[in-house]
Amino acid sequence: MIETNTFGATTIAQDDYKMPELAREMNLAAAKLAKQACDEFSTPDKPRFVAGAVGPTPKTASISPDVNDPAVRNVTFEQLRQAYKEQVEALYEGGADVFLVETIFDTLNAKAALFAIQNVCKEKNIKMP
C-alpha cells in the first residue's frame, strides 16, 4: 500500500497558504505518482495499491476557535464536505484504490470526509473496500 502525500491537500487547508485553487492539482498529481510506483512494483503475487490520504483541516466544525464565544464556528459541515469531496474526486481520478481518512481529531470533520467519500462513490458508481 502506497499512501499519497495529500494529508493537508484540501481547499480549506491550502487556503491558509493562499493556494486553495491548487488543491485539486495536488491530489491528482500525488495519486498519479503513487499509482506509477504501484504499477512499477506490482506483481501477480504482490499487488500494490494506492491509499488516497484524506487528513484534517485547520478548521473544525465542533470546536470554537474563540474561547470567549464557544458557539462560534469557523467552518460549516457543508464546506468541509465539499472540500473533502473535491479532494476525493481528484484522488480517485489519479488512481487511488482506497481512501485513508486519518488523524482527523474533530469527529464532525471526519464525518464530513466520510460523507464526501460516500457521495463520490455513489455518484461515480465506485465499489471500494
Model-derived regions, located:
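Domain-level signal for soluble alpha/beta catalytic cores
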Residues: M1-P129
